[in-house]
Every structure is written in structure tokens, then in C-alpha cells.
Amino acid sequence: MAKKKAFIPFLYLASIVFLPWWISLSCNKSLKTWITNSWNTRQSETFLNDIQEKSLLEKFIQLEELFLLDEMIKEDPETHLQKLRIGIHKETIQFIQMYNEDRIHTILHFSTNILCFVILSGYSILGNEELLIINSWVQEFLYNLSDTIKAFSILLLTDLCIGFHSPHGWELMIGYIYKDFGFAHNDQIISGLVSTFPVILDTIFKYWIFRYLNRVSPSLVVIYHSIND
């Protein structure tokens, strides 16, 4: 009976790890058809941000130049304009299809992530007892470590996450999350998050050391500052 009770938190922890993947896969399959039909049946206006509008205009200009060059070389001047209009019309339809697919992709990923967050939040609330058991195990494990190992681990973690060499890693991670929600890549927003988010984390971490560790384990704080210096 005791072994069974000890196994339940491990099962709960494994379910938390694999549940987001399962929710994402299930929601993508179930919501894709509904979102696609809903998007295609509505007479929605086309909203483009500055990046999408600039990219679309560049594609049209490149397309027009390529068609003009190609048709002027191969055909007589009297016929190349007609083929130019036909070619641009076909490419315009392809651009519209690409835009619709991109919008559907954005809505699908955003809806899936929100739904996944809601389900995981409810799952965590329902599994509060298992989380308390896992938390007690983690605290017991950390308590058995020496202050030197704790200080080294804290220093290593902070250097990896909020050190001077971490911006590239933050850029990749924020870019991945930004893309996972289906948003168009925006260097300005990503750069702004990379330059501010680690600074906020660093401030919170230093405040945590000052308020919590100074009270719980002053020797750990002394060792941490000694290693850091």
C-alpha cells in the first residue's frame, strides 16, 4: 500500500510532462477542421501588420519584375502584357491562400496553447495532494545537499539563465514560444523581451537571496558570494 502511494506522485509527474504534448496533438486534430471552416465561411476583412504588408508588397514587386523580364525575352511585346496579368492573377490567388493558411495556423496554435494552459491549471489544482508530496521530496533532497553544492548549483543556474552570455539562448527560447503561438516573427518585439526579461528575473532572484536565503541559511549566502566574487 505504501509503495502504491509512493508511485502515484511519479505517475502524476509523468502525466504533467506528457499531458501538454497529448493536449496539443488532440486539439490540433479536433480544432483544425472547425477553425478552417469557420475562417473560410466568414467574410472577414484582411488585417495585415506592417511586417506582413511589407513582405507582401516586396513579393508582388519581385513577381512583376520577373514576369516582365521573362515575357519580354520570350514573347512579342504585344502578348507579354496579357500573360503578365494572368501570371500575377495566379500568384495573387496563391498569396491569398498562403495568408489564409497563416491566419488559420495562428488561431489554431493560440487556441491550443490557451486550452492547454487552462487544462493544466485545472489538473494542477485537482492534483494538489500529489504536488505537495513531490514538493516535500524536493525539499528533502535539497536539504541533504551541502551548502557548497547548493551555492555552486545556484551560481551555475543563474549564469546559464541570466548571465552575460545568456541573451542568445533567451532569443531562441522567446522566438520559439512566439512562433509556437502562431505570431509572425518580429525582431523588435523579441529583442525588447530579450533585453528586459532576464533583467527582471535577475532582480527577482537577488531579492529572493536577500529576503529568503539570508533568513533560512546565512552560511549559504556567504558561500554563494564567495564563489561569485
Curated annotation (Swiss-Prot):
Molecular function per GO: antiporter activity; proton transmembrane transporter activity
Annotated localization: Plastid, Chloroplast inner membrane
Pfam family, one: CemA
Reaction catalysed by this enzyme: K(+)(in) + H(+)(out) = K(+)(out) + H(+)(in)
A biological process term (GO) from this entry: potassium ion transport
Chief place where the protein resides: plastid
Residue stretches spanning the membrane: 6-26, 114-134, 189-209
Signal peptide: none
Mode of membrane association: Multi-pass membrane protein
Cellular component, GO annotation: chloroplast inner membrane
Keyword vocabulary terms for this entry: Antiport, Chloroplast, Hydrogen ion transport, Ion transport, Membrane, Plastid, Plastid inner membrane, Potassium, Potassium transport, Transmembrane, Transmembrane helix, Transport
Record-linked PANTHER family: CHLOROPLAST ENVELOPE MEMBRANE PROTEIN, CHLOROPLAST ENVELOPE MEMBRANE PROTEIN-RELATED
Similarity comment: family membership: Belongs to the CemA family.
UniProt function note: Contributes to K(+)/H(+) antiport activity by supporting proton efflux to control proton extrusion and homeostasis in chloroplasts in a light-dependent manner to modulate photosynthesis. Prevents excessive induction of non-photochemical quenching (NPQ) under continuous-light conditions. Indirectly promotes efficient inorganic carbon uptake into chloroplasts.
Protein name as annotated: Potassium/proton antiporter CemA
Biological classification of the source: Eukaryota, Viridiplantae, Streptophyta, Embryophyta, Tracheophyta
